[in-house]
Amino acid sequence: MLTVFQALSMEELYNPKIEPQNFLKHVPVLKSVEVEGRLYTLTFIRQFENASVIHLHVDWNETVDMETIHTRMNRPKFKLRALEGYNCQSDGAGGGTGRVTHRFTVSPALPDDVSGFSFIFEEYDDNWMGEKTGLEIEIKIS
């Protein structure tokens, strides 16, 4: 029974991966929110014919030491809360000292004008089986 519930909690793993096709353009957004000393910025959206790729950049003050290296290896992960009518998938992250950029693929493609959209990013302590940490970052586009 436990296996059934674990499989249900990993539904995202069983959805087909969205592969953006035929790049169209970049849509600049540049909206930021600061929470607990970290600056979260929705920098831009890459538009494709069949999907959009959202970039969430996180920036904070960090120095390099052994504790920082250990912390970096255990960074929390973010998921984009599903937008009504859209399929949202995490597409990885990358970064370095004091910064990381998360990518999310949304299908079908978002409109070029995302005014009125509210993007909510939920923090998890692990990619797949992690628990929500309670931190939610909301970036509203006016």
Task: Give names to the regions the model predicted.
Residues 1-55, 59-142:
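Surface-exposed edge beta-strand/loop patches
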